Amino acid sequence: MSVPGPSSPDGALTRPPYCLEAGEPTPGLSDTSPDEGLIEDLTIEDKAVEQLAEGLLSHYLPDLQRSKQALQELTQNQVVLLDTLEQEISKFKECHSMLDINALFAEAKHYHAKLVNIRKEMLMLHEKTSKLKKRALKLQQKRQKEELEREQQREKEFEREKQLTARPAKRM
């Protein structure tokens, strides 16, 4: 609730002197900055400034040093963590390369087994071809022998027929 100010001679209430209407300048204040004019009025003593600076430093310096040390420790811990992370990454890569190597060995085993089977089949085919060659040779020899025997038989029959044929007798 506001308290009415002194009344005017005609009895109307007036506003207090500290209340201003919008847009009215404040009496006694200028449009300049509050810091203007202070520098001229204030004389600075070097000793006071030095003591204030020392006090300010003594108040904030321990916290700043602790913060600096904490930051250094954090930086060192980060470096250690980065090194550890790099080592783990290299181990992970080695594991992947080991998996690749294991896969290659498994594939090599598979192809080795295939080669062994192919070798067995080739040996078996070689044995079969050798047996077939021997059999073919024997059959060829048998045919040649049979042909020779037939030829000899024909010659014998021819000789026999020749002997059986009538010959004119010789006159003596």
Swiss-Prot record:
Region: Disordered, residue numbers: 1-36, 135-172
Cellular compartments per GO CC: axon cytoplasm; BLOC-1 complex; cell-cell contact zone; contractile ring; cytoplasm; cytosol; endosome; filamentous actin
Illness: Hermansky-Pudlak syndrome 9: A form of Hermansky-Pudlak syndrome, a genetically heterogeneous autosomal recessive disorder characterized by oculocutaneous albinism, bleeding due to platelet storage pool deficiency, and lysosomal storage defects. This syndrome results from defects of diverse cytoplasmic organelles including melanosomes, platelet dense granules and lysosomes. Ceroid storage in the lungs is associated with pulmonary fibrosis, a common cause of premature death in individuals with HPS.
Full protein name: Biogenesis of lysosome-related organelles complex 1 subunit 6
Originating species: Homo sapiens
Disulphide-bonded residues: none
GO molecular function, one term: molecular adaptor activity
Keyword tags: Albinism, Coiled coil, Cytoplasm, Disease variant, Hermansky-Pudlak syndrome, Membrane, Phosphoprotein
